[in-house]
Amino acid sequence: MDGAVRGQGCVGRLRSFNKTKKKNRNCSDDMRNGDDEEKKYSHHDMKNNLRNDANEEKRKSSDDMRDGDFEEKKKCSRHDMKKNLRNDANEEKRKSSDDMRDGDDEEKKCSRQDMKKNLRNDADEEKRKSSDDMRDGDDEEKKKRSRHDMKKNSRNDADEEKRKRKRKCSDDLKKSVVNDASKEATSHSDWRKNRKAGSDAEQRGKKLLNGDKKAKSRKVTTPFFEKMRKIKMQRTSNQNGEKNMKSDGDSYKKTVPLSVNKGKMEKDGTNKRTLSNTLVAKERKMRPSDSMEMKMKKKKRDASFVQPDERTAQTFSTKNKEKKRKAPSTPLKREQKERVASSDNKKETKKACIVAIGNEKKNCRDGKKKKRKAAFAFFKFVRDEFEELLFIPPAVAPSLKDLIDRHVYLEDSEGKCSKIRLSVVDGSLAFYEGWNSFVSEHCIKWGEFLLFEYTPESTFSVRVFGIDSCERLHFSVKSGGKGAVKKRKERHTLSDDLISHYNGQYQDSEDIHDGPNVSGESPRSKEPKITVDAEIGTRNLVAKSINAASETQDSERVESGIGYGSLGALGNKVRNLSNGECDTRSDSVFCIQEKTRRSEVIIISDEAYSTQVDEDTMKQTAPSEASEIHHVTINTQKDLERVVDGVCCESSVALNNKMGNLILGEPKNKNISPACSTEKTNGSEITPTTGVIPLTQENIDTVKLNTLSCFEEDRSTTRESELAAAIPTTSETHDSDKDLGQKHQRNSVQVNSIIAVDKYPNDSEMNISGNIFRIYEAPAGTRCLEKWKRGIVNGRAALDDIGQVRPEKTQKAGEKLVGNCGAMGESPVDLRIESDVTDTCLKPILNIPIEELSILDSVSISKCGRSRTEVNHLFNQKGATVQLQTKKEPLKPTGSSGNRKGDKIAVSVNRVFAHQSELQIPQQENGNFTSCVTPVALLPAKAELLDLDDHSLQFCIPSTIQKWLELPKSLPITCRQKGRYDRNVVILKDPMRRLWPVFYHDKPVFVGFTAGWKPFAAANNLQAGDVCKFVKEMDEDELAFQVYITRK
């Protein structure tokens, strides 16, 4: 029961449980439904809440953002404000800096403008101040510009010639290309017709290309012409190919075009060398380019290898045979022919080449055509300094650039030629070497007009027009004709005795006037002779200078017989004399003709010609009392020596290092010893007025005085009429001599001459050489120098001990002569010394030959007055000095003695050599001279010019020679002569008398020479240790210094 109950209970429980379960299910459904609704509502609320919350959050965040943005904006605004403030400050600073800069720029601009103005003003001031001083510099700049222009013109001419040649070559090439193209077309057609005969064509091609046995011609390697040739040939081949393409068809395609390279042809399968008869091989061998090149080569050879004879025949041939012109025969051609005939080594080598023109063969000379210049003309007026050179106009100079440093020929109206060298002097082209001889031969004077016409082969035709505007067809001085000798003999005929004496001595020698004597082309002779013609009178003495030129135109000497002049050698060739028709040669005869009441003729003969007299004898003859002719024969021992003659203060030029004796006097038909001779004639005792006493020694250590003289020509035409005038008395002669001396003071020249030591116990006369014009009263009568001619000594010496000499500068009246003149005063010294006719003695004049060299330091003449004269000679040799002192008792001057300053006159003698310890000086005892050996003490002496310390500067060249030279002290230049205080242009005269403009600076930092010093040092070969001495020349017009150089 319990179990049932229990079972029932379980069931009930289950039922209740199920019921409860159903209830719960229903409740749960209800709850679910309610929950669903609630959930729906809660979901909606939750969404709304969420939205609200989100909105609220957004609002809050937006508010927060707004607050943050505001704060950030505030911060940003503050930052921007700061930035703006900074930018504003920076902008203000920039503006202020820009303003400051602008102000500084304006100030700088103002300062720059002021500086530029100041610089311009300073530059203008310097230009104004240095314009006068820099004239030489401006001339040099002009010369440089002219050189630059000449170079430009020459370059332009060369470029123009090159262009013309290129144009001609291109035109010839075009013509040849056209002709070759036409010939090529015909050759192509013929070749196609005959292509079966390949071997024959090959042989013909080989003959065409190589000739018979000639090497293949080279191809034109110029890329421009090669390209042009290919283009032309391609065009012509294309034109011809279009015409022949229709007929030939496939055969044309087999040919190789011109533009095919060798590499492309070699890429073919077959070997072209083995297939000699193939079309390709034939085409290669018969290419038109090769044939065209051969033809071009032939044409060029034809143009270049035409014989000159055929050329002249072609150019000068006309229809009329009479009008045929031959090539002119000029001196240059003749000289070239002689040169080729004389030397086998200078023969022109000719190369013969055979040029095939059709079937003919011509032999041609290998060389270029000689260009012939067209004839042109120019004229020149003869102005100052025309004796040495003549400048050619700059416009004409470029056309003569090929003749620079070559010889040309000047042909005058008489058909005579002179050989002259064209040289560049100071940047300009000029007639230089040989021009002086041309001037002297044709007597060209200042103011005349010369017309030059250039003809081919370096020849100029010269026409001379005088001052009267008329052409001079004949010239007074002729170079080697018989007519000139006849004219000379008509004017100055010698007496019968003199002619017989002359003919007797020289009858075996050839006539010295017969051969032609052209300047520069001297004929060779077996026996050289020198003859000098001059006319000397008691009133007038004309000493003509000799202006001659040797074969090389290097050596020229000045000769004069009596008067103030010199006797010297002119070289080993025949020379032309300016005073008449004479030929001068070395080792020769000096003949001086005189036509006067009492005239003297000095004949210096060679030992070979003089057989009638001894070495030391003098032969004098007098044909009549009215006209006495004195012959003095002097043996020169085959070489004329430096002879010092005392007649009218003469000097001489040495020919060699041997001694010659000259003694002149007036006894009749007597032989007089060279030492001394006195005789009574017509109640008076007459002694030779001139003598030369040699100074000898056992070892022949002797002293030699070097003398040079230059002459100034007096252009007065009244001198010629005085030659034929009557001879006045002695008093009249003195008056005329005084007037003549006053006239010659205007045209005086500095002269280097001998200081003659004269010693007279009987108060007679003393001869002092060194002045340009002197008048003496001698026993034979007063001899005065009347007419001088400038002796232009140009070039090197032909013989020993003769250096190059240039003419001195002409001194004006009132100028002081310093350096190589005889006296220092306001005018040249004019000494007129009187001697008693009844008692005269031989004047001892030193003739000193040379063995070893040294330099004369100074020669002074102190107390040159009427009461006493001292002559001191100081010779310096390696620290030793030879001092010769001669004292003289009162003199008797009869004329003006010249102006002197103070009691001393300083004399400078250039190039005096000394080496002797004992001198042999003759002395007079009882009317006869005896020679005695007088020892001369070697005393130390300073090398300086006396009384010229304020006008000289001596220094030693430094160890290094540069473009500039620093001087130990300032040069003696007065402020009045300066163009500017600190710098100036100074003229330096070297020992050869050449002028050198040099820039001189005188500043606290530097004193010395800059521009111009280097060429001066190079030309004079200055070395370290040489001593230079600058002596100021007393010339107010320019700053000039004579430079004496002592080698170390």
Curated annotation (Swiss-Prot):
Start-end of Basic residues biased regions: 16-25
Keywords: DNA-binding, Nucleus, Repeat, Transcription, Transcription regulation
Residue spans of biased composition, Basic and acidic residues class: 26-134, 151-162, 169-214, 243-253, 281-295, 332-345
UniProt DNA-binding region: 375-468, 953-1048
Localisation: Nucleus
InterPro entries: B3_DNA-bd, DNA-bd_pseudobarrel_sf, REM16-like
UniProt cross-references to SMART domains, sorted A to Z: B3
UniProt xrefs under PROSITE patterns: B3 (PS50863)
A GO-annotated cellular component: nucleus
Origin: domain of life: Eukaryota
GO MF annotation: an example: DNA binding
Renumbered residue ranges of the record's region Disordered: 1-345, 505-528
Protein name listed in UniProt: B3 domain-containing protein Os02g0598200
